[in-house]
Regions:
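Hydrophobic N-terminal alpha-helices or hydrophobic patches in metabolic proteins across all domains
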Residues: 1-153
């Protein structure tokens, strides 16, 4: 479903990024699956391609979680919470990555800023976000359910 709605997810990501940039004082707009902003007197943009979207990774974990929940006794609630948290961390990391690319382009110029931030900083942010999301996901999905005793706070 996420992969089929990939275009809508990428449009949402671009709109969210435009909102984030505007909140920190950078004039920006979403245009389809891209966020655009003025740079050196002209409008430029960063596109959310399929590889730059949270949809494929989230879909992969959703499918894996469904298979795992079917094969072993996992709480569906824990799986849903885990996938939701995973998607949220992926989204935050991706928004931070794109904001970093925009900031570096504004600081270093279009070509050099994109090159440095997309390859080096963007990859580092994505890797840290991925690891954090997976660790959180595993902890949430595999945690022992809490049992409440009557009258306990």
């Amino acid at each position: 479903m996420l992969l089929l709605a990939g275009q809508a997810v990428r449009s949402f990501e671009a709109s969210a990024q435009a909102l984030v940039l505007n909140l920190v004082g950078v004039r920006a707009d979403a245009l389809g699956q891209a966020v655009i902003f003025p740079l050196q007197g002209r409008w430029v943009g960063v596109a959310f391609s399929l590889g730059c979207s949270v949809a494929p990774l989230t879909a992969l974990f959703l499918a894996g979680s469904a298979a795992a929940a079917w094969m072993r006794p996992l709480s569906y609630r824990s799986v849903l919470i885990g996938v939701g948290a995973l998607a949220l961390v992926f989204m935050v990391a991706n928004q931070l990555r794109i904001a970093t690319i925009v900031a570096m382009m504004r600081t270093m110029g279009f070509e050099r800023g994109y090159e440095v931030s997309h390859i080096f900083l963007g990859s580092a942010i994505s890797t840290i976000g991925f690891v954090a999301a997976v660790v959180l996901f595993v902890r949430l999905v595999l945690r022992e359910p809490t049992v409440r005793t009557p009258g306990a706070l």
